[in-house]
Swiss-Prot record:
Protein name: Ribosome maturation factor RimM
Cell compartment(s), UniProt: Cytoplasm
Subunit organization: Binds ribosomal protein uS19.
Recorded coiled-coil stretches: none
Alphabetized InterPro entries for the sequence: PRC-brl_dom, PRC_barrel-like_sf, RimM, RimM_N, RimM_N_sf, Transl_B-barrel_sf
Main location: cytoplasm
Family matches, as Pfam families: PRC, RimM
Annotated domain remarks: The PRC barrel domain binds ribosomal protein uS19.
GO biological process: ribosomal small subunit biogenesis; rRNA processing
Transmembrane spans: none
Family recorded in the similarity comment: Belongs to the RimM family.
Amino acid sequence: MIKTVQDLINERIAVGKVVNTHGLKGEVKFFPYTNSEEIVKNLSSVVLYNREKKVFYNLSVESVRRMNKLFLIKFETIDTVEAAEKIKGCEVFIKYEELPPLQNDEYYFYEILGCEVYYESGECVGKVVDIIETGSNDVLVVKKKNRETLIPMIKDCVVEIKKPEKKIVVKELEWI
């Protein structure tokens, strides 16, 4: 079966973006979409995709090292600044199964985005359209028509997260 670029992307998750070149030997500056250093440090075989140019590359990672808030990545076969320039702007994708396993009360943002949120009574609050990282806890941005509701991801508010059903049940609190 022939796979399209869209098929390749749908089977994977974006973990960051190549934002610039670094040096003359093909290293690139990588901006991670995740706060998990483990995911970035364990990159091996990746798909790079540039949405604007509609071009993709299957590459193997040679090395990864931290540089402030970014990482420097050296890909096999990318050995010059000119070659690195060609992948600038590409998002870096890995297969979902390459993500580290989580504890029961943990989640990846992609598992929560798009979930329908309901009160315990069954009333629909809306759909999760964004997640705000506050430092102490995440906050769901739930939208229904033109109304946005902010729901903190804390035990006092969230009753249950049903990841396979893309459903979250929350307590009906006065201030929500």
